[in-house]
């Protein structure tokens, strides 16, 4: 069944899930929330709506497009049919870069990483550490490659999809990392779950609780197992620790400025 695009989530459970269900489910939910919230009007053309939900370039690996971005392009499809050499060239170049990331970096690196992981008892600290770093490279180039292929293919056809990665490994902290990594998913959770729960508007404790809820759901989205839920919760704790650290640092700086000002005032007097 995997050859025709379906996967079973457990060998003991005869449940079939189509490829990309986690992406187009969120895309459809986002559309529903936007219509309910008055951000857009409901699309009356079933074919245009179906194209929005199942837009094939980004169906398998994203990005998770918003109705406010992709749907207007579909509604005005006649305007993008005009041939544009620059657009097509840029789209093909983006696709080529995506294929390079996937085939020449991610797939090659995975051979080394899998060899070390599958035989971890044979390797020492240095090799295992290097494999961990290479695994991070593999994940980024694999996911980022798929996204760039999708964006490039869409661009060739005249559609502009959102950028899903912004050099995430150059992030200065975990919060900055999630602003750069899988941007479409992070922004989706922020707009449709975190903010409706109260965001950071209802006190510090509520903010941290909302963070735990969002990252717990995010972990479950990545994989239907407790491993992924724990992974999500760990990222939530890192976010909370980072926020507490920033708050403490801000208080220290503020108190230091007060002391400095008081000292200068005494000298003047």
Predicted regions and their residues:
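Membrane-embedded transmembrane alpha-helical bundles that form the catalytic cores
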Residues: 1-269
């Amino acid at each position: 069944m995997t050859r025709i695009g379906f996967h079973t989530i457990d060998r003991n459970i005869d449940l079939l899930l189509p490829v990309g269900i986690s992406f187009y489910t969120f895309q459809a939910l986002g559309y529903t929330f936007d219509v309910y919230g008055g951000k857009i009007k409901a699309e009356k053309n079933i074919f245009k709506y179906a194209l929005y939900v199942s837009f094939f370039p980004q169906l398998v690996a994203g990005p998770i497009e918003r109705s406010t971005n992709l749907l207007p392009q579909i509604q005005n499809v006649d305007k993008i049919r005009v041939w544009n050499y620059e657009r097509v060239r840029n789209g093909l170049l983006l696709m080529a870069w995506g294929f390079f990331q996937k085939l020449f970096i991610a797939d090659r690196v995975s051979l080394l990483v899998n060899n070390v992981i599958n035989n971890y008892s044979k390797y020492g600290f240095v090799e295992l550490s290097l494999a961990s770093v290479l695994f991070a490279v593999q994940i980024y180039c694999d996911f980022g490659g798929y996204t760039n292929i999708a964006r490039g293919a869409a661009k060739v056809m005249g559609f502009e999809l959102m950028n899903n990665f912004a050099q995430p490994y150059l992030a200065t902290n975990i919060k900055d990392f999630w602003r750069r990594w899988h941007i479409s998913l992070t922004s989706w959770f922020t707009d449709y779950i975190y903010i409706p729960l109260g965001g950071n508007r209802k006190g510090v404790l509520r903010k941290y609780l909302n963070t735990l809820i969002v990252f717990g759901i995010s972990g479950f989205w990545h994989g239907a197992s407790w491993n992924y839920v724990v992974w999500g919760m760990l990222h939530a704790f890192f976010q909370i620790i980072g926020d507490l650290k920033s708050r403490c640092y801000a208080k220290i700086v503020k108190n230091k400025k007060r002391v400095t000002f008081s000292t200068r005032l005494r000298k003047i007097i």
